[in-house]
Amino acid sequence: MKFKGKSMTNMQKVTILSFDEVYLSDEICFDKQEQRIIGPCKSAQVVMARGLFSDWKQPIYFKFDQAMTKGILFEIIRKVEPYYSVVAIVCDMGASNQGLWKSLNIDWNNNNFFPNPSDNEKKIYVFADIPHLLKLVRNNFLDHGFTIDNSKINSQCIQYMIKNSNTDLKVGYKISQYHLDVKQAQRQNVKVAAQLFSH
């Protein structure tokens, strides 16, 4: 990245860091190059740097069984900042990341940024991962429904639409009982959540 950055404009170097825990099988493997056994590990924290105004991305950090912390995040930013301009971070709203947001004094009502650890005059904005938010909204809709203008709408409305759609005029195209019956791992499927709210 350091070498590539020399040929980029300042605009191309505007960077967002996205990170997530990737869940792994808990098997062990042997690293031939390092001559050591790796695992078993439950997850890997992976950080990706990507251009905001240009089409590039690069994995820059990974560590097994490691939640993101303020210290790790600041260390990564300090290593990237001499060559690129970090303006935002993006992550899901899992419990460990909610703890990170709290340690950065991020809250929805008052503060959506923190000072850049390399330059306190610069701000780094914090965004929730949109696919994760979409799944959370869908799950909340299925579990509790929404209240809009003092009226409750819930999955029973969708159920009624599915039941009363006929073959000549299908109101909820591609919506089926499957979209309402998602359980466990199926609740992590972004495509199914997007389909439910797209009709």
PLM features per residue range, with description:
Residues 1-54:
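Structured nucleic-acid-interacting core domains from mobile-element enzymes and related host factors
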Residues 59-199:
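Non-catalytic regulatory appendages
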